[in-house]
Amino acid sequence: MKLKYIIPILVMALGTVSCDFLDLSDPNKVTVGNFYQTEADIANVCAGIYQPFKDSHYFTRQDYFTDSYARVLMFLDPGVAGGENYAFCAHSLTNAHSFISNRYNSIYKSIDRCNILIKHLDDVTYEKATTRDTYEAEARFVRALGYFYLVSEFGDVPLVLSKPGSINDVYAANVRQPKEKVYQAIYDDCAWVLASPLADLQSANDCGRACKVAALVLDAKAHLQQATDPVFTARKAELCAAAKTSLDAAWAKKFFNKLEDINVTDAFDLETQKGSKENIFQINYVSGDTNNGGSIPLYFAPQSYDDESKSLVRDVSKYSSPCLMLKDKGDKIFPEADRTKDLRFINLIGSGIFGGSPVYYTRKYTDKATTTVYYGSDIVVFRYADVVLMQAEVAYHTGDAANAMKWLNMVRQRAGLDAVSGLSGNNLRDAIYEERIREFVGEGKAWEDYLRGYSHEELTNYFKADGAAMFGEKDFLFPIPYSQVILNPEGLPQNPGY
């Protein structure tokens, strides 16, 4: 990765030296060496490890890399921005695509901030002995989360687990490491978090910070992702068992009795989302706040609404660009027969018009509390419905159909749908992964879900039949940005086909 993305503070310091080499000891200069002097300094840096989440292509527009890439959500105008938005659902990405470069760099920026924080945690003293380890636990969770997305989307990637000390260290680290090593780093970080004094679950005021249950969910998701990767077929049983252990532990720490006790809208409603008992980890935004508001609702809005009461924002004139709509009016996601009873369709899906044609859109990101373009809709990264449906996945992948249906039916019945019974084999698998698409539409999970549920051959045939004629074996990984490959062509070779 580019030097500026691995060690931004070091580069900034080097740049300062080169411009003013005669004044190297100015006591007023803030450098890596003298910035960390108080516990408050560390707290500020810890807050900064979360900031890259809000970069334009980390979580803010993650759906392009997940739901759109899986053709669950479609960008309907191929002419916008030179076709870059449309390239995801068309599977026509290149190594020069700016979204790919932005995402790759934003994730590594987040990882670098975590490494810098960990490096300097012992530079100061703390009022409470547990504070230091709490900060390290947060950094390790954020770092592990970044590596989960990198290994899932790019395959073998550079694995940087400490702050590089020199430019030579930076270039030495810019070498792709096997997926197995990356997954192990994720598990090691999650294990550290679980042994730390970090809270099991955060309060409403701190819901945007890491917690132990979030680490359990991440650990389970990574184990399940690795278990279903064809490279690790021989370890599938072992990895699924590890995933179940973490899922069981996460479920045991919930603050509610039954999933059906929580309304399907609680995780997303502006009034309830920050204190929702279903939410485990989320990216926080503040409605109407210039510095802390987000633009998420605008990425899912149609050009016009069939029902203005279901608009995503208060002032619909703020919206002008085409965005992500449910494919084929959501017919495959929400069957017509279920639409009058599925509470998710009734409460979280709306209809409108794009280009003169009817479309459906997700209403999970709605903020009518402000007339500004700074919205308060949080991005929910992990919630308990995910724990439930991953339990169903693990049960399916280990041949336990009865338990798979038990967990699957928890989500279906909460949504107002009938329980399933008597399913096995591919019918059970399809029921689980179709339910995941319905439950998490617009939440940035579909692509990883498809990879866990289906073989490369099945997905290739599916996407080609669905209209993605260009889809092929290369598309199971994103391209490494060209701007990174040229820094070390031998150590950072491009993924095949790009």
Feature locations, PLM:
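Acidic, glycine-rich segments characteristic of secretory precursors and extracytoplasmic regions
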Residues: 19-67, 116, 180, 488, ...
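Short, surface-exposed recognition loops and adjoining beta-strand edges that mediate ligand/DNA contacts
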Residues: 33, 60-78, 160-163, 198-214, ...
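Bacterial Sec-dependent N-terminal signal peptides
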Residues: 1-28
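Conserved, well-structured interaction surfaces
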Residues: 43-57, 80-154, 177-184, 190-204, ...
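Elongated scaffold/linker segments in the mid-to-C-terminal portions of large proteins
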Residues: 39-41, 46, 50-57, 73, ...
